[in-house]
From Swiss-Prot:
Zn(2+) binds at residues 412, 415, 430, 435. Keywords: DNA damage, DNA repair, DNA replication, Ligase, Magnesium, Manganese, Metal-binding, NAD, Zinc. One of its GO terms (cellular component) is cytosol. NAD(+) binds at residues 36-40, 85-86, 117, 140, 177, 294, 318. Pfam families: BRCT, DNA_ligase_aden, DNA_ligase_OB, DNA_ligase_ZBD, HHH_2, HHH_5, Nlig-Ia. One of its GO terms (molecular function) is DNA ligase (NAD+) activity. One of its GO terms (biological process) is DNA replication. Its cofactor is Mg(2+); Mn(2+). This is DNA ligase.
Length: 678
């Protein structure tokens, strides 16, 4: 094989530099400088050159972020510097007592500063860089020994593979928090629910579980983020002298550092910061459960040192978790559209995080056995991550006499078929494809917002259609008549006409949405888009081999096998034929663009936040329009926000935008910006 010419080597350096700058701008600065299609083109060019000339591959190349599967176990390694946990304070009085303790140890210190940072609800990791290159990533573990997960760490785009320094220190260690943004957490749980799998209870568990995946490709698909918060410069005379300086140095090196930090001069300022974020944290795109307060001066930190468990110079000032006791009235099971049978605790209603909670998932029979939860038990429930209600524990001391352990049913409560628990799975399933619950779930999923988006066809109407024998499969929806629907309870001619129009309108939904609507196990909306981009028609996808499916970037073996198997089932082939006859879209159509080229729109490269209820557009529709026009939609208002799209009942985002002087748009103004001709 011929060696690479100087021109090829120069091109490789150029490509890496362009891709690294684009990645930094996108993931760290939140300010894209390159369109996705351009990034993908440059990435593929670099990948092709490295395939042809493997001697040019370097550890910091953008192509090396996602590697092959890890070995079947992680290697335990000692931390160079112990990764201590923090002492907790649950109110400002406990914080004041902590301050009194450290001041007694340093009576000569009269002037000091605190650095306040939000405590991110994720997993702590330690990164080692040598001569500017990432060489190791380790979990916290017990603080002394962690597990090396470097291939997984490399998939996190906000962690630089190479420091953005001309003359990097010989060796540094960076500590920080790997976490899942709320939107990504919800997307992952939606896909797990689609697949009939147990859901993650909260973003922290999801982040920890993701980091310990043996396949880096799965980690890459889950889009972890990373905030750096500690810097140790080893083997170098030039070291920062304060925590604040360290955070600024980390930013210079290319790390994402939480912008919501503050340098405080007094306990009163810490109090203000704590109270502010107790309210504002609900508007953040990630979960935070408190504030980390550190003494700023490193010399003072060194003077105070550590206890056996904690540093004396830092404390976690946490917000109280919302937990409450309630009584279990019943334990039932739900049968999902994939046949997954999920036990649910039905409880006396209780208020948590501003909502009334009376149901909590128990996930599967293993979790039921672990809790030993019984009807009549008093339990502690928590709005986990303020997202999913979960049963934390059973208070056995309050258990009534003569209660019986709960037994999972052996027959489906809907169709009475024998339930099975497939080998290697935690979930019990109904495998009867004619089960009414599976049909009901399939129809509701098909009509859902991210699938065919058939307005007016929710679960209640679906149940009416099934109970009256009008539909036996998804394809039957497209043969319904106005008079059939009008005869149903509480429908009438007007509602029936609206529903038929909505069903007919769904025939124009693109191939990616149709694919998602089919409900193939493990295929969520994002995966469906990946597949439809690579297989332009149902014929291409149904004839694809397992190998060609798995070779698609972002598609792992589990998804590939599920898709491959689904298209081999005769009933599914019949469903596809029937839907094709109903004129659904089973291929990617080339359309004349409705909107001007991205580069010519006023929204190109702009960041937009949406708040309130818009007059006609749904939030996901507005987001799609903005992104088609070259803009980017984020969840929270910051100094980087260009526009706030405002609807009715706008919340605190509007107040913050006004304080920052950010331009506001109405829906009408947005549509004129996107397409001035309309």
């Amino acid at each position: 094989m011929p060696s690479a010419t100087p021109e090829i080597k120069q091109r490789v350096d150029q490509l890496r530099s362009q891709l690294q700058k684009a990645s930094y701008a996108y993931y760290v600065l939140d300010n894209p400088i390159m369109e996705d299609v351009v990034y993908d083109q440059l990435y593929r060019e670099l990948q092709n050159i490295e395939t042809q000339y493997p001697e040019l591959i370097t550890p910091d190349s953008p192509t090396q972020r996602v590697g092959d599967k890890l070995s079947e176990q992680f290697i335990s390694v000692n931390h160079n510097i112990p990764l201590y946990s923090l002492e907790n304070a649950f109110n400002l009085q406990e914080f004041a007592r902590w301050q009194e303790r450290w001041q007694r140890l340093t009576p000569d210190v009269t002037q000091f500063e605190y650095v306040c940072e939000l405590k991110i609800d994720g997993s702590a990791i330690a990164l080692t860089y040598e001569n500017g290159l990432l060489v190791r990533g380790v979990t916290r573990g017990d603080g002394i020994v962690g597990e090396e997960i470097t291939p997984n760490i490399k998939t996190i785009r906000s962690i630089p593979l190479k420091l953005a320094l001309d003359n990097p220190p010989v060796r540094i260690e960076v500590r920080g928090e790997a976490f899942l943004p709320i939107e990504e957490f919800e997307r992952i749980n939606q896909e797990k629910q689609t697949a009939g799998e147990s859901l993650f209870a909260n973003p922290r568990n999801a982040a920890a579980g993701t980091l310990r995946q043996l396949d880096p490709r799965i980690v890459d698909r889950r889009r972890l983020q990373f905030f750096a918060y500690t810097l140790y410069v080893i083997d170098s005379p030039s070291t920062p002298t304060t925590q604040w300086e360290s955070l600024e140095d980390l930013q210079q090196m290319g790390f994402l550092v939480n912008p919501n930090r503050k340098l405080c001069q007094s306990e009163a300022e810490v109090d203000q910061y704590y109270q502010l974020w107790d309210t504002e944290r609900h508007n953040l795109p990630y979960m935070t459960d408190g504030v980390v307060v550190k003494l700023n001066d490193y010399q003072l930190q060194q003077q105070l040192g550590f206890t056996q468990k904690f540093p004396r110079w830092a404390i976690a000032l946490k917000y109280p978790a919302e937990e409450a006791p309630t009584q279990v009235k019943n334990i039932t099971v739900n049968v999902g559209r994939t046949g997954a049978v999920t036990p649910m605790a039905i409880m006396e209603p209780v208020q948590l995080a501003g909502t009334t909670v009376q149901k909590a998932t128990l996930h599967n029979s293993d979790r039921v056995a672990q809790l030993d939860i019984r009807v009549g038990d008093t339990v502690i429930i928590r709005k986990a991550g303020e997202i999913i209600p979960e049963v934390v524990r059973v208070i056995e001391e309050l258990r009534p006499p003569n209660t019986q352990p709960y037994q999972m049913p052996t027959q489906c409560p809907e169709c009475h078929s024998t339930l099975v628990r497939p080998k290697g799975e935690a979930v019990t399933r109904c495998v009867n494809s004619s089960c009414p619950a599976i049909l009901r779930g399939s129809l509701v999923h098909w009509c859902s917002r991210d699938a065919l988006d058939i307005r007016g066809l929710g679960e209640k109407v679906v149940i009416l259609l099934i109970d009256n024998g009008l539909v036996h499969s998804i394809a039957d929806l497209y043969h319904l008549k106005v008079e059939q629907i009008a005869s149903l309870e509480r429908m009438g001619t007007k509602s029936a006409n609206n529903l038929i129009n909505a069903i007919n309108k769904s025939k124009q939904q693109p191939w990616s949405r149709v694919l998602y609507g089919l409900g193939i196990r493990y295929v969520g909306s994002v995966t469906a888009k990946l597949l439809s981009d690579n297989f332009k028609s149902v014929e291409q996808l149904s004839q694809a081999s397992f190998t060609s499916l798995e070779s698609v970037y972002g598609i792992g073996a589990e998804i590939a096998q599920s898709v491959y198997d689904w298209f081999k089932i005769e009933a599914n082939q019949t469903l596809i034929k029937n839907l094709q006859q109903a004129e659904l879209q089973f291929e990617t159509l080339s359309e004349t663009p409705k909107y001007p080229p991205i580069s010519s729109t006023p929204l190109a490269g702009k960041t937009v936040v949406i708040t309130g209820t818009l007059p006609s557009l749904k939030r996901n529709e507005a987001q799609e329009l903005i992104e088609k026009a070259g803009g980017k939609v984020t969840n929270s208002v910051s100094s980087k926000t260009d526009y706030l799209l405002v609807g009715e009942d706008a919340g605190s985002k509007l107040t913050k935008a006004q304080q920052l002087g950010i331009s506001q748009l109405s829906e009408e103004q947005l549509l004129k910006m996107i397409n001035p001709q309309e």
